[in-house]
């Protein structure tokens, strides 16, 4: 029979290794894909335990017939579909442990037919918690398998619910099949990264390890300053910009920043973050990179032939999409590209194309995901001078 240990080892595969051994494991794993890796260390996360600012939890029956908030095994391994408690897992933020415990108590003591343990399938399969390290903001997103339901809304806005969660100040959103409903507060929280503050909505992407993200962005800033050749007309392209975090972070050393992303909600959030941080020299564009990058470079050169161009890309775990790699290769004026990757497999795949025009000249490995095999890569790519061949 499956057990909580099975679930813990699936979520946190390296949890039984001491931390220095975890870092060695990550480095060796990366070298399997990149044998000529330009570094021999993985920088440690500032926080090894309790580091996550976002987690999704399953809701369902435990093996003791109790409604439980935690994790279940994949279907092929979970014959009973039990959900196992998550509160002892090392990656949870302390507030998450507190919230999970209180909401679990509420669900057990105020049971409803739409998620009852007496029924085969719950209509409340999961919840997500987003929290912050520097602002104390918290948001809970409940997922409901069905259209908007006033009974469900009233349940999570009842006095009894808030009596149980007591002093925790939270924002609550319910994701129905046909809409998202704000039950309490807002559908966003705020988080600080060094001197900057960012709005994070229920749909936003934001790095899951806040303290390590500050290290990550400072490393990107250091590398950018190391390789940029200031002319007074320095232009940055923040590709796959999401909510604008990296572009905003680097904006102080560039004349102009263009953030490009295909997700409209991300661009809306990015523009809000631009105003929140009073960054006048950044422009966010909702469009495929393939459609606008070369055009933007041409327009900048028309305005000022002395313009220099730098790019940073932080794609999702699946890597670059479509023809982005070829689009980047087709920009002769783009001398440097910093590739930030959380997946060495897709980075290697993308480099099979980017490597036709760019070569890696510096790499930093940083642990954003303690107790798991995952690791963040920062790779500086420089345009190859093909004229010498």
Swiss-Prot record:
A Pfam family the protein falls into = tRNA_U5-meth_tr
Biological process terms in GO annotation: methylation; RNA processing
Query: Which keywords appear in this protein's UniProt record, sorted alphabetically?
Result: Methyltransferase, S-adenosyl-L-methionine, Transferase
| SUPFAM superfamilies per the UniProt record, alphabetical | S-adenosyl-L-methionine-dependent methyltransferases
**Which terms does the record give in the GO molecular function aspect?**
RNA binding; RNA methyltransferase activity
- State if Transferase is listed as a keyword: yes
Spell out the InterPro entries in the cross-references: MeTrfase_TrmA_AS, SAM-dependent_MTases_sf, TRM2_met, U5_MeTrfase_fam
**What Gene3D superfamilies does the annotation carry?**
2.40.50.1070, Vaccinia Virus protein VP39
Which enzyme class? transferase
What does the record give as EC number?
A: 2.1.1.-
- Residues involved in S-adenosyl-L-methionine binding: 207, 261, 314
* CDD domains the record matches: AdoMet_MTases
Q: Which residues form the active site?
A: 342 (nucleophile)
What's the family? Answer: Belongs to the class I-like SAM-binding methyltransferase superfamily. RNA M5U methyltransferase family.
Protein name as catalogued: Putative RNA methyltransferase R405
What are the top taxonomic ranks of the organism?
Viruses, Varidnaviria, Bamfordvirae, Nucleocytoviricota, Megaviricetes
């Amino acid at each position: 029979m499956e057990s909580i240990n099975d679930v813990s080892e699936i979520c946190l595969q390296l949890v039984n290794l001491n931390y220095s051994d975890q870092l060695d494991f990550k480095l060796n794993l990366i070298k399997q894909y990149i044998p000529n890796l330009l570094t021999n260390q993985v920088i440690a996360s500032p926080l090894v335990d309790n580091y996550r600012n976002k987690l999704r939890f399953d809701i369902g029956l435990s093996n003791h017939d109790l409604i439980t908030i935690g994790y279940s095994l994949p279907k092929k391994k979970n014959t009973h579909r039990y959900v196992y408690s998550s509160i002892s897992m090392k990656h949870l933020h302390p507030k998450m442990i507190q919230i999970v415990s209180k909401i679990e108590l509420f669900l057990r003591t105020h049971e409803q037919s739409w998620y009852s343990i007496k029924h085969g399938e719950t209509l409340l399969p999961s919840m997500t918690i987003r929290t912050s390290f520097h602002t104390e903001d918290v948001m809970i997103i409940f997922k409901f398998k069905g259209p908007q339901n006033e009974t469900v809304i009233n349940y999570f806005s009842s006095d009894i619910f808030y009596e149980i969660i007591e002093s925790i100040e939270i924002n609550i959103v319910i994701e129905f099949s046909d809409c998202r409903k704000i039950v309490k507060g807002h559908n966003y929280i705020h988080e600080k990264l060094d001197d900057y503050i960012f709005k994070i909505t229920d749909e936003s992407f934001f790095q899951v390890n806040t303290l390590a993200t500050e290290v990550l962005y400072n490393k990107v800033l250091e590398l950018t300053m190391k390789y940029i050749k200031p002319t007074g007309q320095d232009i940055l392209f923040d590709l796959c910009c999401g909510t604008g975090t990296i572009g905003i972070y680097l904006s102080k050393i560039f004349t102009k920043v263009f953030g490009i992303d295909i997700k409209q909600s991300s661009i809306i959030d990015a523009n809000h973050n631009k105003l929140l941080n009073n960054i006048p020299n950044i422009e966010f564009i909702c469009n495929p990179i393939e459609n606008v990058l070369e055009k933007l470079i041409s327009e900048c050169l028309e305005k000022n032939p002395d313009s220099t161009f730098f790019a940073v890309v932080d794609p999702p775990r699946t890597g670059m999409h479509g023809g982005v790699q070829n689009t980047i290769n087709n920009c002769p004026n783009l001398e440097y590209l910093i590739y930030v990757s959380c997946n060495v497999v897709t980075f290697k795949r993308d480099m099979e194309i980017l490597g036709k025009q760019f070569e890696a000249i510096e790499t930093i490995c940083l642990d954003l995901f303690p107790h798991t095999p995952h690791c963040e890569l920062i790779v500086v790519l420089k345009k190859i001078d093909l004229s010498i061949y």
